[in-house]
Amino acid sequence: MTLLLVSLLLASLLQISSGNKANKHKPWIEAEYQGIVMENDNTVLLNPPLFALDKDAPLRYAGEICGFRLHGSGVPFKAVILDKATGEGLIRAKEPVDCEAQKEHTFTTQAYDCVDGPDGANTKKSHKATVHVRVNDVNEFAPVFVERLYRAAVTEGKLYDRILRVEAIDGDCSPQYSQICYYEILTPNTPFLIDNDGNIENTEKLQYSGEKLYKFTVTAYDCGKKRAADDAEVEIQVKPTCKPSWQGWNKRIEYAPGAGSLALFPGIRLETCDEPLWNIQATIELQTSHVAKGCDRDNYSERALRKLCGAATGEVDLLPMPGPNANWTAGLSVHYSQDSSLIYWFNGTQAVQVPLGGPAGLGSGPQDGLSDHFTLSFWMKHSVTPSKGKKEEETIVCNTIQNEDGYSHYSLTVHGCRIAFLYWPLLESARPVKFLWKLEQVCDDEWHHYALNLEFPTVTLYTDGISFDPALIHDNGLIHPPRREPALMIGACWSEEKNKEKEKGGENSTDTTSGDPLPIHHYFHGYLAGFSVRSGRLESREVIECLYACREGLDYRDFESLGKGMKVHVNPSQSLLTLEGDDVETFNHALQHVAYMNTLRFATPGVRPLRLTTAVKCFSEESCVSIPEVEGYVVVLQPDAPQILLSGTAHFARPAVDFEGPEGVPLFPDLQITCSISHQVEAKADESWQGTVTDTRMSDEIVHNLDGCEISLVGDDLDPERESLLLDMASLQQRGLELTNRSAYLTIAGVETITVYEEILRQARYQLRHGAALYARKFRLSCSEMNGRYSSNEFIVEVNVLHSMNRVAHPSHVLSSQQFLHRGHQPPPEMAGHSLASSHRNSMVPSAATLIIVVCVGFLVLMVILGLVRIHSLHRRVSGTGGPSGASADPKDPDLFWDDSALTIIVNPMESYQNQQTGVAGVAGGQQEEEDSSDSEAADSPSSDERRIIESPPHRY
């Protein structure tokens, strides 16, 4: 039994051992397979075909292929064994594949034999082969246009290689079916062609006079000849011939004073004719050199403006008007600017040496304040002289000053477009320092104001009220020091060594006669005006800006909406503005906000030329456009003229004793000065109204400043021995006003408010010497503002002097006329010869009949005389005011005397004096006599509906 079990066990072991020895080899397959599967199909065609071989064949199980295993993430395929004996297999898609989703698939496959099944411990597996499966496309999608409607514009008369391009796309994945092979224009008889890329061109020159808009339809085909499902529409507009230029601007731009900032080009746009640009630069230039000194500034005089701006006093005029006390300017050529200021011309061979001490106000002794703390102020118009070029310096001022420690020296020169200030704090020890500025204003041949503040070691230069720090500071220690002698020269400078230039005999050398001769060189060539120096205290920046800054110019404030890449630059004088950018639309927006601004309420009217120049850079230099220059002008309109109205009592009489008093009689005791601006508006739509409605409002504060008033005489000048005009000098000096008192006029000059001028003019008095035989005077008062630009009406005041006459005996036939005689009147000397002496100096008492006869005769004579007086009055009213200067201008006024015969008639002027005191009126209101009202009409201001500047004769102040 035991032997039987052992034999069975050995038999099974031998069988197993023989089976293991039979499955010796692994299956074999190709290393790589290429497969193709059609879209929407599942069978993969492999190259080479899928076969697995096993060298253990024909053994059962060991030589058979049981299957293929696929390896990869998300492989949408599966492997199928077709024949185990031959090892043939097949790869199929689990579901139809989509080429548009994935065109290619890559994975690995592995074959295994049939021993113990695919996962058996004794199963043999082949190596892993790579399988590439490409999904073949099917033309299932039609072309689709990117846009349904295409628009373009062309210029007439041109043939274009490409007007626009239409584009269609296809959703298929393969190049064969996804590419658009050609386009086609479906609309017949159109002058356009389309190529296979969708580019449309015109076949003939299009004319704007013909068809202005072309419409046609295009379609597309893919390479599988599948037509687009929806066709596209094309519209091409024909435009007239394009000229690159600025469009939408006005040549004439009107500016109303007081309007603030006014846009110059609110609707401007740049037409580039479709030429692409990558850089645009425009320059706007405002020409104001013809307005006063370079631009519109405050219209007040220099003296008045200094007071308004709060400038400190104490400046010394170094180039005053030639006169007995200022003869050093007599040899210079004198000109006058539009604002009547004095201008000196230096021709390059002239200079003036200002005497120290005396009228110049610069002492010859120590001048500590002037040595290191002072302000130089002057106007200059200078250009580069062609003969000199930029090589030679030109000296504006040169000064050596004596102080307690020794001598200091400074000079101000121009060199081309550079201005330099050389300062030598102490000639004995300190080294000179030179401050340099490079400014285009120095050499542009335009008027500019310069103010130099020295507070050593700080030096600040102001040009037209704008401060500039020095560009360079040099330590010029090698310069030879000038001679230690006080001297001040304008227009040139002396050389460092005595007689150095004189010995050379240079043509540009002149000797002065102040002390020892000084050789002169570096002459100035240009214009200077308003040259002054003030020592000890510097002018502040605010004061200098108020005094000399331009009140008009170009302006740009819309920085918040300034586009990206835009640059804006305005020069200091605001006469030049530059814009730079790279986008046309952004550039247009920026240029539309460039404005003109004039801060003066009463701007100088006239034309300001305007120029816009443009430079562009294109992507294509060959076809780059050129933008023509734009020229226009700003018209500053006439401002609404302020109407200065003087009013008060125009006629009064006083006893002579009042005029002979120590204070005289006030001429304008109730004077009123008003200033207003009248604006004329249209009348309301009312049939019963025939006139216009005028809206008058008070002017702003600056208008209420007067800069001068004049009291003149109508008729003969004042006789200083018998009469005079008086004013309180202390009150004038306290307010900084100047008084000029002549026999023909009295003037008050200086900027002050209307209230101050009213107060001062009410103190103006007329005084007579005791016993002066004067009976009537007429005075004319007028005022002005803004350097005499606007004048008031002429307010005329008539004054009658009432004289008393000593009581004398009268003949009986004139007793009844005693009611016309004032008890205190005294006949004037010139009428004494016509007085009637009494023929009855005895003590006889006449009878009653005689008295009655005398009274009747006297009454008859009185009636005749009154009739003659009335006839004479009517005659004077018709013939005008042709009477003597001493007579009253009022024919109806009883304050008169008339000598027309041997009789002397004295009319009591006090009879109507009370009526005149209550009934007299000034220019503003009240009732006047008929003849006075006709005279006053000429003196009144213009009617409120007239917008004009009042023309007046030149003033004496």
Curated annotation (Swiss-Prot):
Record's compositionally biased regions (Basic and acidic residues): 944-957
Domain Cadherin: 29-145, 146-246
Annotated keywords: Calcium, Cell adhesion, Cell membrane, Cell projection, Endoplasmic reticulum, Glycoprotein, Golgi apparatus, Lipid droplet, Membrane, Postsynaptic cell membrane, Repeat, Signal, Synapse, Transmembrane, Transmembrane helix, Ubl conjugation
Family matches, as PROSITE patterns: CADHERIN_2
GO terms for cellular component: cell surface; dendrite; endoplasmic reticulum membrane; GABA-ergic synapse; glutamatergic synapse; Golgi membrane; lipid droplet; organelle membrane contact site
Keyword Cell cycle belongs to the record: no
PTM (free text): Proteolytically processed under normal cellular conditions. A primary zeta-cleavage generates a large extracellular (soluble) N-terminal domain (sAlc) and a short C-terminal transmembrane fragment (CTF1). A secondary cleavage catalyzed by gamma-secretase within the transmembrane domain releases the beta-Alc-beta chain in the extracellular milieu and produces an intracellular fragment (AlcICD). This processing is strongly suppressed in the tripartite complex formed with APBA2 and APP, which seems to prevent the association with gamma-secretase.
Membrane side Extracellular: residue ranges: 20-848
Any one GO molecular-function label of the UniProt entry: cell-cell adhesion mediator activity
Bilayer-crossing regions: 849-869
Topology in the lipid bilayer: Single-pass type I membrane protein
Region (Disordered): 916-957
Entry's localization field: Postsynaptic cell membrane; Endoplasmic reticulum membrane; Golgi apparatus membrane; Cell projection, Dendrite
Signal peptide (residue range): 1-19
Cytoplasmic side: 870-957
BP-aspect Gene Ontology terms: adaptive thermogenesis; chemical synaptic transmission; cold-induced thermogenesis; excitatory synapse assembly; homophilic cell adhesion via plasma membrane adhesion molecules; inhibitory synapse assembly; negative regulation of excitatory synapse assembly; negative regulation of lipid droplet fusion
Glycosylation: residue positions: N299, N327, N347, N508, N741
InterPro entries membership: Cadherin-like_dom, Cadherin-like_sf, CLSTN_C, ConA-like_dom_sf
Bias kind Acidic residues: ranges: 928-938
Pfam families cross-referenced by the UniProt entry: CLSTN_C (PF19699)
Function in brief: Postsynaptic adhesion molecule that binds to presynaptic neurexins to mediate both excitatory and inhibitory synapse formation. Promotes synapse development by acting as a cell adhesion molecule at the postsynaptic membrane, which associates with both neurexin-alpha and neurexin-beta proteins at the presynaptic membrane. Regulates the balance between excitatory and inhibitory synapses by inhibiting formation of excitatory parallel-fiber synapses and promoting formation of inhibitory synapses in the same neuron.
Family: Belongs to the calsyntenin family.
Matches recorded under PANTHER family: CALSYNTENIN (PTHR14139), CALSYNTENIN-3 (PTHR14139:SF5)
Subunit structure of this chain's protein: Interacts (via cadherin domains) with both alpha and beta isoforms of neurexins (NRXN1, NRXN2 and NRXN3). Directly interacts with APBA2. Forms a tripartite complex with APBA2 and APP. Interacts with low affinity with KLC1. Interacts with SLC23A2/SVCT2.
Name of the protein in its database record: Calsyntenin-3
Provenance organism: Rattus norvegicus (Rat)
Lineage: Eukaryota, Metazoa, Chordata, Craniata, Vertebrata
